[in-house]
């Protein structure tokens, strides 16, 4: 069995790790970095760029450069958070036929799992290049507060990328695994505060030693799947836009190119202000009007940035309070606070967390890598390479069904340890009712309509009976990935109906299979593109070498030689501009043949010159050779 890799599929950055010889190794990508920007770009010549290459060209190609797509995964187009995102990103977010939020690039609609699959493919290849063998299995992390649709969509992304997703685990739980595996014996309770690029999670986790086994039990989890570093960037961007408007009267919001440059500058300034008190945001030629080019130059202090984002930081405290309450604990019961996610490097975040929990957070966990490390450990547990770890995760939100009067009736309460199974008996609302619709919901509100609809199915052919008489047993079964299976059974007839919840949205099996096929076809297309690029490079090199040879040959090349070679050169140059690899190779071969007589003539002349060198010169060269004396030096080091 091959290795099971651990992937942190982040909103802003992604990371891949593997357990090797008992140690976790975070794998560097082709660019030499341990994290990869979760950015995908589609270029004008049909190439798909992922990671740093995509980020580098974002300024010149904003409409076709996709970032923070994780914020859209498993979401409906109508959701407020999606509508808010549409205003902020330069690329196009559109409504899919099934009502989901998709993106549109170059006239083609694509599902978020399809886009995320490109990042996962890059992670998969990074691991394969390092291990020197194919990788087909992975553990992928998701925010703890992801609902069923979002988890399912993440699993779909893995399948599209050619990965068998062995387990979906929560990011804070993964971070706790990374932190707790090598800790001293004894029980302790930790808070994992995970503020990433696009999501916020907090989990209360008890790490216990049971019969020599590390047991990680999640007591409670809470969060906000639309709060993260991207929102901090947006606040700073808005401030810079306002300052520039005050100064020049120009609103940059309608200029995608300027906004992309601003986004990069804001992110850089935010990072700098974690270690300095003040920074300059300087963007020359950011735009132009009738009076000429305009430059943006704004000084931003740490205090200013903190005032812009203070309410965002405060928004993270209420989920912390709720998680503690759900776990039945007080702040004083917490032994350690672990910070995860790049945004936790901000001093204001660290200060706010320390004030709330009454203790400084640990600094020995790398906030960018801990989640991938934990995923790799879980992968090793599933592969049987690590024996002394037991992970008990929870479902983040209450699951139930809609009952009479539009009420949400919960079957599995939030923070229930998974996997779990729960049944409850319901009945009909009307006399002689022949069918019931089971409407599955997820959320904490009493009103059914206020919760997330996960799907509906019908149980038909119920024998006629007065209302309240038929007994319909509804069973909810959550697997270890946090994905829900629901069944309904008429106890009188034994008739049963069941579904794996794929959400009222989500991708159908046919769509996923099509995307898997597309991804495989793209891999073939990518290989052909690489081969074509290599052929073009070889063609260019041969053109350059041949032109150099003609120049060096001077009058040794006859007019006939030159004419033959120039004709072949022209044909190869034309072929290099085209897209036919076979044509390029054929014209390279033709040019080599055309230039061979001249090359042979020049080689023969050079050889003749070597033989004709005066004997006196050779004798003189021999006289110049000096015998050197040497002494052996012993190295005693």
From Swiss-Prot:
Residues 603-623 are annotated as: Disordered. GO terms for molecular function: ATP binding; ATP-dependent protein folding chaperone; unfolded protein binding. Induction: By stress conditions e.g. heat shock. Gene3D superfamilies: 1.20.1270.10, 3.30.420.40, Actin, Chain A, domain 4 (3.90.640.10), Substrate Binding Domain Of DNAk, Chain A, domain 1 (2.60.34.10). The modification Phosphothreonine is found at residue 199. CDD domains: ASKHA_NBD_HSP70_DnaK-like (cd10234). It comes from the Bacteria. NCBIfam families: PRK00290.1, PRK05183.1, prok_dnaK. HAMAP family: DnaK. This is Chaperone protein DnaK. It comes from Pseudomonas aeruginosa (strain LESB58). The gene is dnaK.
